[in-house]
Amino acid sequence: LLPGENLTIQLNYLAKIPSDRFTGIGYSAKKMNLKNWFLSPARYENHAFTKNSNANLEDIANALSSFEVSLKVPLNYAVTTDLIATKKESDSNATSYFLSGNNRTDFSLFVEEKSSFTNYKSDLIDIHTNLKDNAIDPIQKAIIIDRIVHFAKNEIGLYPHTKITVAQS
């Protein structure tokens, strides 16, 4: 593969998801919090693959990738993600979700019996969060989130995707 060229590879595989007992990421009795659970190419810079220590889940050195995920969950379960839902189908037992995202290094995916997330829409981005703070009401929280989004845009630039998840692990 020469510089500037690209290649499409499609992989179908089963992933073994760990318990969330130690890191908060994985599965528990009635929910899953999935982050960095998929195969992804390493970033290639300066004629070498970027290495990372894998000492922390947050230090992964992925290359930009496009993702297509199909997921089938029981009817009473909710799915929250920062990917785009391109299609959703239900039958008498389950709901199938078809999700996609382009030019991403990672994504988050939450499957819960009852969603713990609240959606806040800004003029710039949709924020899905399950952070709890009983000291402020939902309207105040929406105003604060909108101010943070605009501050971040002015200081570091526009977030490159239309949705973001902020989760309490």
PLM regions: where:
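Short, flexible loop/turn elements at secondary-structure junctions
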Residues: L1-L2, V73, N103, D133
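Extended, low-hydrophobicity, Ser/Thr/Pro/Gly-biased non-transmembrane segments
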Residues: I9-F110
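Intrinsically disordered, low-complexity Pro/Gly/Ser/Thr-rich segments with frequent PxxP/GP/PP motifs
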Residues: L1-Q10
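Helix N-cap / beta->alpha transition motif
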Residues: P74, E113, H128-K132
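Extracellular/periplasmic catalytic domains that process cell-envelope and extracellular macromolecules
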Residues: L2-P3, N62-A63, S90-D91, K121, ...
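Juxtacatalytic substrate-recognition/specificity segment
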Residues: V69, T118-S169
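Extended Gly/Ser/Thr-rich low-complexity repeat segments
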Residues: F107-K121
